[in-house]
């Protein structure tokens, strides 16, 4: 028993020693390889330079160059001295004047920064990348500053640990190198020195052969446990095991991750569902700024579950040709049944109270099942339901459709797609490739029953073949999203009266805590009202167009109906410190063409980027300053204050360093985030502080995002330096900005 306990205690320690020794060997081997590559590249570049130099020397010898004729005597010129220039070639010595330049005042100190035209969200830095140099004076005054700074990062400094670096390449090599050890070798320390030397020689002899080919069996769990104990930041043993599987599988030619869908245009295209085909688009596409790989919104909004009330493109109901599917018996009724079912049958709400009244719940057909084999039972249930409880609703639909269809067509609208199948001509036996089937499922969610348009987009199938494929897949295609008909549309005047009362309630809530402004996140509770549990209501934010609630939600901002410039408190958007939304404010000019220079609405400058031309020059107050090139009027937009969007905790950590430098570009955006223009920003970052400024800053809500705008506090003339109030205390103002600008005499 004692021997077993000794082995169990010795095992993990022995594996840790192996991990450390193999890791150091691989690191040293990697350094040697890197040094050899550098030497070979240096020798190659040196040889190319010598060859090129020899060619240029030969060209210079063949050219006939005449020296520039210069006066032999320059002593008569004031402030100059003679300077002779000699050449190794057969050129005579030249005498030229040497002029002395007067001393020039140096420009103010400027730290490097990257220009930005919009905000850029970054993650928190949990590791101190470098210890900033504050100068000897700062360290003498506060010797514990560096220690406190490191404590803010939990003692994590980049490059501080000896074994802190391990990338994917070294990780795979380390696991493969440790795979040559056996589990029975835990008691190697008890062997004789001669036996250990023999084992070490055998390992070194076979190491190169084993590293050159993949391991025969999967590495032991002890290897990953030992690596996890040596590198705890890299994850647990299970996570390292999964990572090793992914890295080794990706090395195989043509191997794809298990969740990856083959290219729809490639030879290995598969027939997959619509959600799987569009997974990458839904994941990478930002529905708030309409960009892929958005760097401003880390949490992408989910696709809207509501369908547009008015389609942007009109549907063409005419047959596309003599072979069009509309000439088939029952085809028009089939398309009309799909349209009627989409309008009449909204999807079920997950819990929550209904806000709208349906015509008759018993007449609504059940949702199609996914299993194709059970489609017959589902169809019989649907038919029974429509025959017993749906007669009144069918009559109402027939009366509405009489203008565009015949009575025979209207009588067949209650039938389901599967029941329509025996009435049409025998379908063609056409094979659909995986790419064509996947493309059809993608397009059916956009064009619904417009099979002619789907056929034109697919390109390899006729509209009749598309129609027959749609009938075949009726039981597995998800129902189309319902139109937003939960609540009847109110009249505009009554809607705005209710909105005014709602704004007064919100304003009363915000009076007690006016400084609490929280970041907006779209609410995602479709088919449920925005009550006290809604995140927008909790944060005292208005619901935006990106929320999943109904368009008639009482917490939604409806926009304005102004006919003027929207620059007074008569405009609801201006009163709510928001810019006019081009999707909501349709009468003030905010929805005009984006390239239009003369826009009647003056409350959409930030989103349009209508900034003024700014000039950078040394300031009379402190360091650099920013100056206006063209005159601006009072309350006119000048520029947006852009930079990195960081959290409040990250701003506290950075602010301690900026305070020591006595230079800070931090600007509070809301209670959650701060704009830092130190590393990235635009030219307005050089605007200095003043207690008598000519500009003012205002945080506005612009299409769901808080953004900082700089506006003119008074009329500003050409060439004036821009100032705005940093809201410093009196002590901080004297510490950071020692000189106050002179007041202009009116």
Swiss-Prot record:
- Places the protein is found: Nucleus
The record's Gene Ontology cellular component field reads: chromatin; chromatin silencing complex; chromosome; chromosome, telomeric region; ESC/E(Z) complex; nucleoplasm; nucleus; pericentric heterochromatin
Q: What happens on changing residue 133 to C?
A: In WVS; decreased histone methyltransferase activity
Show the catalytic activity.
Answer: L-lysyl(27)-[histone H3] + 3 S-adenosyl-L-methionine = N(6),N(6),N(6)-trimethyl-L-lysyl(27)-[histone H3] + 3 S-adenosyl-L-homocysteine + 3 H(+)
One Gene Ontology BP term is: response to estradiol
What are this entry's molecular-function GO terms? Answer: chromatin binding; chromatin DNA binding; histone binding; histone H3 methyltransferase activity; histone H3K27 methyltransferase activity; histone H3K27 trimethyltransferase activity; histone methyltransferase activity; lncRNA binding
Residues modified to Phosphoserine: 21, 76, 363, 366
On whether Cell membrane is a keyword of this UniProt record, the answer is no
The entry describes its oligomerization and partners as: Component of the PRC2/EED-EZH2 complex, which includes EED, EZH2, SUZ12, RBBP4 and RBBP7 and possibly AEBP2. The minimum components required for methyltransferase activity of the PRC2/EED-EZH2 complex are EED, EZH2 and SUZ12. The PRC2 complex may also interact with DNMT1, DNMT3A, DNMT3B and PHF1 via the EZH2 subunit and with SIRT1 via the SUZ12 subunit. Interacts with HDAC1 and HDAC2. Binds ATRX via the SET domain. Interacts with PRAME. Interacts with CDYL. Interacts with CLOCK, BMAL1 and CRY1. Interacts with DNMT3L; the interaction is direct.
> What name is this protein filed under?
Histone-lysine N-methyltransferase EZH2
Organism name: Homo sapiens
């Amino acid at each position: 028993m004692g021997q077993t306990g000794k082995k169990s205690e010795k095992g993990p320690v022995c594996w840790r020693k192996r991990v450390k020794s193999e890791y150091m060997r691989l690191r040293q081997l990697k350094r040697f390889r890197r040094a050899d590559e550098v030497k070979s590249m240096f020798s190659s570049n040196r040889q190319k330079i010598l060859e090129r130099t020899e060619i240029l020397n030969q060209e210079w010898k063949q050219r006939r160059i005449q020296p520039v004729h210069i006066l032999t005597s320059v002593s008569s010129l004031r402030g100059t001295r003679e300077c002779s220039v000699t050449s190794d070639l057969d050129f005579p010595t030249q005498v030229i004047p040497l002029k002395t330049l007067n001393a020039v005042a140096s420009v103010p100190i400027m730290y490097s920064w990257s220009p930005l035209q919009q905000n850029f969200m970054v993650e928190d830095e949990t590791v101190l990348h470098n210890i900033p140099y504050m100068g000897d004076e700062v360290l003498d005054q506060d010797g514990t500053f560096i220690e406190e700074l490191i404590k803010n990062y939990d003692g994590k400094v980049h490059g501080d640990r000896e074994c802190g670096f391990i990338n994917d390449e070294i990780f795979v090599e380390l696991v493969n190198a440790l795979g040559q050890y056996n589990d029975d070798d835990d008691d190697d320390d008890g062997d004789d020195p001669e036996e250990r030397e023999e084992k070490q020689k055998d390992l070194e002899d076979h190491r190169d052969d084993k590293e050159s080919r993949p391991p025969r069996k999967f590495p032991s769990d002890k290897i990953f446990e030992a690596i996890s104990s040596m590198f705890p930041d890299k994850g647990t043993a299970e996570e390292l095991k999964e990572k090793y599987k992914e890295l080794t599988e990706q090395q195989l030619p043509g191997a794809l991750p298990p969740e990856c869908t083959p290219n729809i245009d490639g030879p290995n295209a598969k027939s997959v569902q619509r959600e799987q085909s569009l997974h990458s688009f839904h994941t990478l596409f930002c529905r708030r700024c309409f960009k892929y790989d958005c760097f401003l919104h880390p949490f992408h909004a989910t696709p809207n579950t509501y369908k547009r009330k008015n389609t942007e493109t009109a549907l063409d109901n005419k047959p596309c040709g003599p072979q069009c599917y509309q000439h088939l018996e029952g085809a028009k009724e089939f398309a009309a049944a799909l349209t009627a079912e989409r309008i009449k049958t909204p999807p079920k709400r997950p819990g929550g109270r209904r806000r709208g009244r349906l015509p008759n719940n018993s007449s609504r057909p059940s949702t199609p099942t996914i299993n194709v084999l059970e489609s017959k039972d589902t169809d019989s249930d649907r038919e029974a339901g429509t025959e017993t409880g749906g007669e009144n609703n069918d009559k109402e639909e027939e009366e509405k459709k009489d203008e565009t269809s015949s009575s025979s067509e209207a009588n067949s609208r209650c039938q389901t797609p599967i029941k329509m199948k025996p009435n049409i001509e025998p379908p063609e036996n056409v094979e659909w490739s995986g790419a064509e089937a996947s493309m059809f499922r993608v397009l059916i969610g956009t064009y619904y029953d417009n099979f002619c348009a789907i056929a034109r987009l697919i390109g390899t199938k006729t509209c009749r073949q598309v129609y027959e494929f749609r009938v075949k897949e009726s039981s597995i295609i998800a129902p189309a999203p319902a139109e937003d008909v939960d609540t009847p549309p109110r009249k505009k005047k009554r809607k705005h009266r209710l909105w005014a009362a709602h704004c007064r309630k919100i304003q009363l809530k915000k009076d007690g805590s006016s400084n609490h402004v929280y970041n907006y996140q779209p609410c995602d509770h479709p088919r449920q009202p925005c009550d006290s549990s809604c995140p927008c209501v909790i944060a005292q934010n208005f619901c935006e167009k990106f929320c999943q609630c109904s368009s008639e939600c009482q917490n939604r901002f409806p926009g304005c109906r102004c006919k003027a410039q929207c620059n007074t408190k008569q405009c609801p958007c201006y009163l709510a410190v928001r810019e006019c939304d081009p999707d909501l404010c349709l009468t003030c000019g905010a929805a005009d063409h984006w390239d239009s220079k003369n826009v009647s609405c003056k409350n959409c400058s930030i989103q349009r980027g209508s900034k003024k031309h700014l000039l950078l020059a040394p300031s009379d107050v402190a360091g650099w300053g920013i100056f206006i090139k063209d005159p601006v009027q009072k309350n006119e937009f000048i520029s947006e204050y852009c930079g990195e969007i960081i959290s409040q905790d990250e701003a506290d950590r950075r602010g301690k360093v900026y305070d020591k430098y006595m230079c800070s570009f931090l600007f509070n955006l809301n209670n959650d985030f701060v704009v830092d223009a130190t590393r990235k920003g635009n030219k307005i970052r050089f605007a200095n502080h003043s207690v008598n400024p000519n500009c003012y800053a205002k945080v506005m809500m612009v299409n769901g995002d808080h953004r900082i705008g700089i506006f003119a506090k008074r009329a500003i003339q050409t060439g004036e330096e821009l100032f705005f109030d940093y809201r410093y205390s009196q002590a901080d103002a004297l510490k950071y900005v020692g000189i106050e600008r002179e007041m202009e005499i009116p």
